[in-house]
Amino acid sequence: MGSGARFPSGTLRVRWLLLLGLVGPVLGAARPGFQQTSHLSSYEIITPWRLTRERREAPRPYSKQVSYVIQAEGKEHIIHLERNKDLLPEDFVVYTYNKEGTLITDHPNIQNHCHYRGYVEGVHNSSIALSDCFGLRGLLHLENASYGIEPLQNSSHFEHIIYRMDDVYKEPLKCGVSNKDIEKETAKDEEEEPPSMTQLLRRRRAVLPQTRYVELFIVVDKERYDMMGRNQTAVREEMILLANYLDSMYIMLNIRIVLVGLEIWTNGNLINIVGGAGDVLGNFVQWREKFLITRRRHDSAQLVLKKGFGGTAGMAFVGTVCSRSHAGGINVFGQITVETFASIVAHELGHNLGMNHDDGRDCSCGAKSCIMNSGASGSRNFSSCSAEDFEKLTLNKGGNCLLNIPKPDEAYSAPSCGNKLVDAGEECDCGTPKECELDPCCEGSTCKLKSFAECAYGDCCKDCRFLPGGTLCRGKTSECDVPEYCNGSSQFCQPDVFIQNGYPCQNNKAYCYNGMCQYYDAQCQVIFGSKAKAAPKDCFIEVNSKGDRFGNCGFSGNEYKKCATGNALCGKLQCENVQEIPVFGIVPAIIQTPSRGTKCWGVDFQLGSDVPDPGMVNEGTKCGAGKICRNFQCVDASVLNYDCDVQKKCHGHGVCNSNKNCHCENGWAPPNCETKGYGGSVDSGPTYNEMNTALRDGLLVFFFLIVPLIVCAIFIFIKRDQLWRSYFRKKRSQTYESDGKNQANPSRQPGSVPRHVSPVTPPREVPIYANRFAVPTYAAKQPQQFPSRPPPPQPKVSSQGNLIPARPAPAPPLYSSLT
């Protein structure tokens, strides 16, 4: 789009004529309203044409796909658009209030909405976010420039104005970063040539290969509703358009924005918006936690206000996108276009996603400024630093909720296989045909599971199969958290729960608060290293009573607020025993304050006026007996509404979780921890793995029964010969003994056998043992008697065979007892 290009007929170039007051005679009947162009330094008037097979025809909205020819800076471009099916879920909900303050719930039929995304033909890495509800309105991002387009007011010929986003006047916005840092960054940008958008996109895709999904909820305050003429439909369409713009920006980081709900405060604001931005942000996230999150599940909520805060465009918590208590931000939507406002919301939502300001860092985005620049310059590009910050969030498990692909009942109802969202009627969606080549579970052409697959995605899906029940899918992160397990029949992990707020932790020195045990020492160690600890109370009182950037209890309007003595422990964190200087990727300001023999260490991160200071004492920290810090005040811990009697409700074998259900210790079964079991709760999923239990039992049987039997069999086989010989030796020995007993028992011998064995030649069948003779049996056992003289010598026996006596042997002599 060179400046020397010739303008075609029908396209009027208007540059700087507004400043000279000459625009009236030039534009004639086509003159736009002054209010429509008062914020522009330059613009063109064009007439887009819709393309069909016949090349051109009159505009006809609400098509699924459409192409237009537009002209900008003398050059004709063809843009191709496709309805953004991922933008709105089937159960998109709008909350409003009647005059009595009663909540009204509406599910508008918006399946055939008119919000599109697309690209410019022939322009690499271009992107478009447009609506054609009442003409073309939206953003076009080309290689090196971004353009806005909107219908020309009161035109009957489909005329539009198109302008560079750099030509939009912007109100200077206050930021906490000093001008010196901004000038230093500007000088650095001028010296170094930034990389091309192609290089940046390639780098980001390498860093963020997995698509994340932010389920966004938007709340519009009463003043902004009044500003829109109290037209609920107009507010709704404007916020849907805003979400479409956000989606076109975040898609560069492989992040998709899904608008899941909208609430319009039609009958009055439901929070106090008096005070500074920090006060309003605190009020909003408290209202969100108490009322909104119970009505509609979402990852982040953004409040849209008409009221300004002295030049501060918005404010949000950093890295809290999945938090129940802090995943929110506030955004000022005053006299600016929705295109410009989109960059503000993208900036504040970026803080929720863990992104810090780019100021003072070596960041590039292919443009003069980036979305996360503290000046809220209206940029459409995220920087390399933002991609790195978001990567850190995901690596630290801070964005687990973003991995939840919208379920079929939460996806846009019009089926569109290939958009990587599981729409109604689909079982999976692997994306483009090329992407589906790498998916082993999903049929890309039908978005159905393959015949052997049970699932295709989710924390509890592996190798196209459900992980067995009891498989850990979300681990315990602190002593105030509880783990979650797969249930064996779903690819999704159980919803994240934690121990109920107010439960004692750290040996009763602190309370659980939103899944973390909040106490001073732990916060000091996070900032100043493992040796640091909380400073004495006198440090808190002395420093926080000053009411400056290093010691305060928040803001009162645009000024720091001094801490009352009773609230000093809930202001700026004060530590001692500091031996390490923190390294955060940014340069914080550290201050030492001597106090009664010690040094009080405090820190100011200088993140800007739109970011809460992480150097303040964490909410939920115990500041006294039965008290906690809340909104920079030391209040009674009863505000946590802890009502769990673990002895009665959980029978002393568990704790209550954030859903007020018992989470049982190992060995006890939910729901009341009264009977034996495997622990867990009705919310956590089964804590034991049935397959693992069967495997365990099988291993026990194998090692304690089968293995010993096998060892015995091997031993017997090896020693078989020795055992066999031992067996027969014992058998033979038993036989000999039996025979000897039979010979000694006359009642069992035949009559031909003599009753006394001759000492000269014993029978052959009777074994001869050395120095042993057969002892005759008598009717009554007598003590052994010995003769008074030795027996006669035995005669020698010749070797002439066995001798047979001529007459029977004489009967044995009878001996009387020895006297």
From Swiss-Prot:
A single cellular component GO annotation: focal adhesion
Ranges of the Cytoplasmic topological domain: 719-819
Keywords from the UniProt entry: Cell membrane, Cone-rod dystrophy, Disulfide bond, Glycoprotein, Hydrolase, Membrane, Metal-binding, Metalloprotease, Phosphoprotein, Protease, Secreted, Signal, Transmembrane, Transmembrane helix, Zinc
Top-level taxon of the source organism: Eukaryota
Pfam families found in the cross-reference section: ADAM_CR, Disintegrin, Pep_M12B_propep, Reprolysin
Organism of origin: Homo sapiens
Subunit details: Interacts with SH3GL2 and SNX9 through its cytoplasmic tail. Interacts with ITGA6.
Modified residues (Phosphothreonine): T761
UniProt name for this protein: Disintegrin and metalloproteinase domain-containing protein 9
Domain EGF-like: 644-698
Residue numbers of Phosphoserine PTMs: S758
Site residues (Cleavage), renumbered to this chain: R56, E57, R205, A206
Residues exposed to the Extracellular side: 29-697
Positions of region (Disordered): 734-763, 780-819
UniProt cross-references to Gene3D superfamilies, sorted A to Z: Collagenase (Catalytic Domain), Disintegrin domain
Cofactor: how and how many bound: Binds 1 zinc ion per subunit.
